[in-house]
Each structure stands twice: as structure tokens, then as C-alpha cells.
């Protein structure tokens, strides 16, 4: 990973400017930033009394929960596909 060129992208998340440095494309970094910004605004509307640090943690926890559910579903589908492929070989 040390040999990959790094991309620097300026983004705005919940009214704050950040410079994100990463190996992903600028478009991907902007997409991620927009997703986080949208989620923070979504949770802010539901919880208007939260300060920004608590809102950021709530957003991170919810995004992590979504990610883990998708990862679990991906693994389940992968196992199902493997079983189906193994079943075809037995025929």
C-alpha cells in the first residue's frame, strides 16, 4: 500500500471542510463524503438536540451497523452460491 499514489480531495461534511488523503479516486472520496454528510443531516433532523461530536458518533455507529449487516448478507449469499456450485459438481 505504501507504493500507491495518494489523492488529496477537499470535501465539506456537515458544514466543516476537510482534506481527505487516500488511494481511492477523487470521485469515490467525494461520494463517501457526500454519503456521510447526508447521513449526518438525516440523523440531525431526527435528533436536533445532539451536538456535533455526538451526532458524528451516532452517524458512525449507524453506518457501521449498515456495513456489518451488508457484510453478513454478502457472506451468507457467498456461502449459498458456493453450496449451489458444489451441488452442481456432484451431479
Curated annotation (Swiss-Prot):
Name the keywords, alphabetized.
Answer: Cell cycle, Cell division, Coiled coil, Cytoplasm, Septation
- SUPFAM superfamilies registered for this protein in UniProt: Cell division protein ZapA-like
According to the record's subunit comment, the protein's assembly and interactions are: Homodimer. Interacts with FtsZ.
Q: HAMAP family annotated for this entry?
A: ZapA_type2
* Entry GO terms, CC: cell division site; cell septum; cytosol; plasma membrane
Q: Which family does it belong to?
A: Belongs to the ZapA family. Type 2 subfamily.
Output one GO BP term.
division septum assembly
Native species: Geobacillus kaustophilus (strain HTA426)
- Name the Pfam families for this protein: ZapA (PF05164)
Per its record, how is this protein called by name? Cell division protein ZapA
Q: In the record, what lineage is assigned to the organism producing the protein?
A: Bacteria, Bacillati, Bacillota, Bacilli, Bacillales
Gene3D superfamilies with a match to the protein in the record: 6.10.250.790
Tell me the InterPro entries matching this sequence. Bac_CellDiv_Activator, Cell_div_ZapA-like, Cell_div_ZapA-like_sf, Cell_div_ZapA_firmicutes
- Locations listed in the record: Cytoplasm
Q: Which domain of life is it from?
A: Bacteria
